[in-house]
Design a protein with these regions (language model features):
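Loop/turn-rich, solvent-exposed surfaces of beta-rich toroidal or solenoidal domains
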Residues: 234-311
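Structural motif
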Residues: 44-46, 107-108, 119, 164-170, ...
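Signature of short aromatic-glycine-proline-rich micro-motifs recurring in repeat-based ectodomains
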Residues: 45, 71-99, 140-157, 162-163, ...
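Blade-level signature of beta-propeller repeat domains, shared across WD40, Kelch, NHL, RCC1
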Residues: 304-344
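Surface-exposed loop and turn segments in beta-propeller and other repeat-based domains
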Residues: 58-79, 123-144, 215-234, 276-284, ...
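Beta-propeller blade signature
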Residues: 45-54, 113-128, 263-265
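N-proximal, solvent-exposed segments at the start of the mature chain
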Residues: 343-481
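Short, conserved, GDST-rich strand-edge loop motifs in beta-rich repeat architectures
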Residues: 26-41, 98-117, 205-210, 311
Length: 481
């Protein structure tokens, strides 16, 4: 029988051993453009990541390269292009990503350059502080701003800007391929939630948050606005934050009297509806992040003041919730994209299953997402022979991208969990189902730890030397919410 507490203690220990990193879990990381020495202009400006505590204490500043250094390119942003400087963080909190230009500070009218002469750059900054700006794009985004970049694994990236739609690029590459087809091509921010790529736009009839294809596109896929979001003139949507699958917050940079602020959208049935807008006094918001802890949503945003702007926070207690100023930057600098350094709980699936005489076994979860402190989280197995045995193979790490054949098992049998940390015996009920409770403690050091799971089913009616069937693989990411 699985000793859940021992397993989780091992997870915590492995995290603690790797926890000596420059960025601290739970802190805010924000893009800053400019040094403060001179007024911001349309020329390229030095770009930084500033780390703050949620109480507004500046912890450190990490400078992006301003010149070629080894394989790392310069990564700068236009001083007055407020749509540039979006920041993202991978679901496992390992990598921050932002986009910029391979140009020295002071390069005039940087957004008007061609990408052949001035490649657009994707910066990947690890939570360990390692900067990688070796990824460039020289075939699109010419004569326009490059705005946002996002990754799910640190090797494959998506980027967008004022033209060219969504593009996909590979770490260290110099070109990109289209990941979106047709309109819109003028996009603002990208994000990944539960392994689905999303974008925001204020172009044409795409005036809110849209999905890009299904999952993470490998070819050009259509952009589809989420049902219920506006399709007529008015909204000016930028960054967005999914608190859960049915709640999405969107930063709108219009003045509050025109609907600007942080909009709360709620999914009802198959349609999204605007619940209310949280509006700060005397300013608006453009970039947005947040946390959900114990059911309480706390949002962090950067204000729309041109320079010397602020980080704002608000706890969503309903319409009219007050904002607090967390920190203010220097004159002649601008804060843009913002993210909370915190892993998000996620579950995804991959691979192919192998049938028994009753079909392909299933693997899944109940009790909500695998967030730390969730006592109800449970692994499930199904579609196995009734009143029989099976196994839950569990590994600490990523699911194998290529399955491993097992001698004696059917030709279709592939194992995706390797190495296996624990094999748990399952006994199925009359419906061929079994469950494995896996309550998660509130141990923040475990945030971001991956768990690979696969169900193995025994079937004595099969003729193979090893009469086994297998589910597809399930990847679990332990998160803070």
């Amino acid at each position: 029988m699985l000793r859940v507490k021992s397993l989780l203690a091992a997870f915590a220990l492995s995290s603690i051993l790797l926890a000596q990193v420059p960025f601290t879990q739970g802190n805010l990381v924000v893009v800053r453009v400019g040094t403060g020495v001179a007024a911001l202009t349309s020329a390229a400006q030095a770009t930084f990541l500033d780390e703050y505590t949620t109480a507004g204490v500046l912890v450190q500043t990490v400078a992006m390269p301003t010149a070629l250094s080894g394989s790392n390119l310069a990564c700068t942003n236009a001083g007055t292009a407020t749509s540039e400087g979006s920041l993202n963080i991978s679901a496992d909190s390992r990598f921050f990503t932002l986009a910029g230009y391979s140009a020295a500070p002071g390069t005039l009218a940087i957004a008007g350059t061609t990408s052949v002469l001035v490649p657009r750059v994707i910066a990947r900054v690890g939570s360990d502080g390692v900067i990688n700006t070796s990824t460039s794009i020289n075939n699109v985004f010419s004569a326009g701003t490059v705005r946002s970049a996002v990754t799910d694994n640190g090797n494959q990236f998506f980027a967008c800007g004022s033209n060219s739609g969504v593009q996909s690029a590979t770490l260290g590459g110099t070109t990109s391929a289209a990941a979106s087809s047709a309109l819109p091509t003028n996009l603002r921010c990208l994000g990944i939630y539960q392994s689905q790529l999303y974008c925001s736009s204020a172009s044409g009839t795409y005036l809110g948050v849209s999905s890009v294809g299904v999952g993470l596109p490998t070819t050009a896929q259509p952009i589809t606005i989420l049902p219920g979001f506006p399709t007529t003139t008015g909204p000016s949507s930028y960054d967005f934050f999914f608190a859960d699958a049915t709640t999405c917050y969107v930063a709108d940079d219009r003045v509050s009297a025109s609907g600007g602020g942080i909009q709360k959208w709620v999914l009802s049935g198959s349609t999204w509806a605007l619940a209310y807008t949280l509006a700060p006094l005397a300013t608006s918001t453009r970039y947005l992040s947040g946390t959900v802890i114990g059911g309480v949503v706390t949002l962090y945003a950067t204000s729309t003041v041109a320079t010397g702007n602020a980080i704002l926070s608000v706890v969503d207690a309903g319409a009219g919730s007050p904002f607090t100023t967390v920190a203010t930057t220097l004159a002649n600098t601008a804060l843009r994209g913002i993210r909370v350094l915190a892993a998000r709980a996620a579950v995804s699936f991959s691979g192919t299953g192998s049938p028994t005489t009753v079909g392909i076994p299933t693997v899944g979860t109940t009790g909500g997402l695998p967030y730390l402190g969730n006592p109800a989280f449970t692994l499930t197995a199904g579609n196995m022979p009734a009143f029989n045995i099976g196994f839950m193979a569990i590994g600490l790490g990523l699911v194998q991208s290529v399955g491993i054949p097992v001698p004696g098992a059917p030709a279709s049998f592939n194992l995706y969990v390797n190495p296996i940390a624990n094999t748990v015996l399952l006994i199925t009920d009359a419906l061929g189902n079994a469950t494995l409770p896996l309550g998660l403690p509130s141990t923040s050091a475990m945030a971001g730890l991956p768990l690979a799971v696969q169900v193995i089913s025994y079937d004595g009616l099969m003729l193979d030397p090893l009469p086994l069937g297998a589910s597809i693989a399930m990847q679990i990411l332990l998160g803070q919410w």
